């Protein structure tokens, strides 16, 4: 039987106390045999949430990463830093990153190439086929049999409307 894949993106919705409480409660979920659960807390609490969930089958993932590596990039978090705290997957191309932070398809595609050439996994979000860089994906799919890529259809026209996508 296939597992149901559930990703909880906590965004910036919870303070530290509520984040830690939620992590402890999620850890108590029973009957996870058919579930693949991943949570994406704010980057400020990633390490603590990962520590709480380390002995469970719940994965902690990053909401975003900076395409630069270590250096003078105020406010960024790079793949090496994520790996240091045990994070091995990230979300990329989320509609809020595109709209609120003006991340362009070009920037997102640059980040996608970086992560596809790393040993981290990625959830690539898109709301139209025009946002999917098939050329990048096909090249990397051919060259990397260990590639772990999840495509997440996120139709912005349906978010918060009650309409089914």
What are these regions (language model features)?
Residues 1-165:
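Active-site loop-to-helix "anion-binding N-cap" substructures in soluble metabolic enzymes
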């Amino acid at each position: 039987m296939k597992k149901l894949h559930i990703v909880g993106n906590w965004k910036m919705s919870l303070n530290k106390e509520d984040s830690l409480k939620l992590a402890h409660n999620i850890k108590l979920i029973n009957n996870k045999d058919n579930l693949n659960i991943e949570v994406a807390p704010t980057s400020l609490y990633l390490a603590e949430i990962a520590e709480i969930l380390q002995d469970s089958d719940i994965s902690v993932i990053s909401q975003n990463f900076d395409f630069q590596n270590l250096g003078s990039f105020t406010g960024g978090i790079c793949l090496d830093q994520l790996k240091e705290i045990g994070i091995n997957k990230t979300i990329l191309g989320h509609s809020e990153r595109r709209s609120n932070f003006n991340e362009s398809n070009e920037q997102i595609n640059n980040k996608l190439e970086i992560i596809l050439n790393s040993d981290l996994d990625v959830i690539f979000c898109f709301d139209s086929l025009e946002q999917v860089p098939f050329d990048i994906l096909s090249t990397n799919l051919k060259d990397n049999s260990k590639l772990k890529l999840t495509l997440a259809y996120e139709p912005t026209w349906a978010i918060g409307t009650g309409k089914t996508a």
